[in-house]
Amino acid sequence: MVTKKSKKAWPWLWFSVLVILLDQLSKYLANHFLSLGHPVKILPFLNFTLNYNTGAAFSFLGTENGWQIIFFAAISFVVSIFLILWLSRTSRSEIMMSLGLSLIIGGALGNFIDRLRWSYVTDFIDFHIKDWHFATFNVADSAICVGVFLLIVHMLLTPSSKP
């Protein structure tokens, strides 16, 4: 009996797993080698500064009394399920789409794990120009941003089949 080989993008989920592993390893190292709020200069424009974020991007809702942790964890989980389903319906040959979805899934689940384990997300990457600092972020956040960028580029460059 010959089995039909799947042409769907399921194998790209391994890339999501890699993103999760890199994210969790980098956060483990940040927690063990950095001190909260004490920057370590890496480059003239880059510090590693340990920060715990109970909110979302740019610490949105970070000062609330705790409900936001459950809220953002639930959003991460639901979005990840939706994106996994989307990836399951994507052709393996759509590399940019598959890679973008995989990056977003990995990033969302990396931060989801932090919220479940610690009730906050560990951030440590601190880009700055002199005294101006961008919001501190992590590997998962980077994966999400790159993934969204790839999806946008894919959607702009792929001709629509609709009239």
Swiss-Prot record:
NCBIfam families noted in UniProt: lspA
Pathway: Protein modification; lipoprotein biosynthesis (signal peptide cleavage)
Reaction(s) catalysed by this chain's protein: Release of signal peptides from bacterial membrane prolipoproteins. Hydrolyzes -Xaa-Yaa-Zaa-|-(S,diacylglyceryl)Cys-, in which Xaa is hydrophobic (preferably Leu), and Yaa (Ala or Ser) and Zaa (Gly or Ala) have small, neutral side chains
Family assignment from sequence similarity: Belongs to the peptidase A8 family.
Annotated organism of origin: Coxiella burnetii (strain RSA 331 / Henzerling II)
GO cellular component terms, A-Z: plasma membrane
Gene name per UniProt: lspA
Protein name in UniProt: Lipoprotein signal peptidase
Active-site residues, record numbering mapped to chain: D123, D141
Cross-referenced Pfam families: Peptidase_A8 (PF01252)
Keyword Repressor among UniProt keywords: no
GO biological process: proteolysis
Key words, A-Z: Aspartyl protease, Cell inner membrane, Cell membrane, Hydrolase, Membrane, Protease, Transmembrane, Transmembrane helix
Location in the cell: Cell inner membrane
Transmembrane segments: 9-29, 42-62, 67-87, 93-113, 137-157
UniProt-listed InterPro entries: Peptidase_A8 (IPR001872)
Species lineage: Bacteria, Pseudomonadati, Pseudomonadota, Gammaproteobacteria, Legionellales
Main EC class the enzyme belongs to: hydrolase
EC id: 3.4.23.36
Function: This protein specifically catalyzes the removal of signal peptides from prolipoproteins.
PROSITE patterns in the cross-refs: SPASE_II (PS00855)
GO molecular function annotation: aspartic-type endopeptidase activity
Membrane topology listed for this record: Multi-pass membrane protein
